[in-house]
Swiss-Prot record:
Binding site for Fe cation 1: H25, D52, E56
Record EC number: 1.16.-.-
UniProt keyword terms in alphabetical order: Cytoplasm, Iron, Iron storage, Metal-binding, Oxidoreductase
Protein name: DNA protection during starvation protein
Superkingdom field: Bacteria
Functional note: Protects DNA from oxidative damage by sequestering intracellular Fe(2+) ion and storing it in the form of Fe(3+) oxyhydroxide mineral. One hydrogen peroxide oxidizes two Fe(2+) ions, which prevents hydroxyl radical production by the Fenton reaction. Does not bind DNA.
Amino acid sequence: MSVTKQLLQMQADAHHLWVKFHNYHWNVKGLQFFSIHEYTEKAYEEMAELFDSCAERVLQLGEKAITCQKVLMENAKSPKVAKDCFTPLEVIELIKQDYEYLLAEFKKLNEAAEKESDTTTAAFAQENIAKYEKSLWMIGATLQGACKM
């Protein structure tokens, strides 16, 4: 896949995840509501930034970003969720799946950018690979049981 096609795919995915993370944000229930509510707010704000960054990089490369809502939703390949009530644990597990998906997509973007000798996009991809690897490590630690003494 070309760099611009991968960026457009990720733009659509970021839009979908922005909506999806709002669903988690508004519809989480349980004892850890407040912390998950704050975490998902940060997550959807990051998706808005990713949406903008992907679109702007596409424009810098001389192509057109996706601006039609219908096209964004049709092109999103990120994991779908069909519910509107979540436990805190479910939200963390679902975000883990979403971040694993994004990590894989950034690796594809990095590979495409390196093939096309696009160092700017490769740097963008690598920065996000590091970000999502760290996020996944933190989520993994959250999902583990208590330490044994």
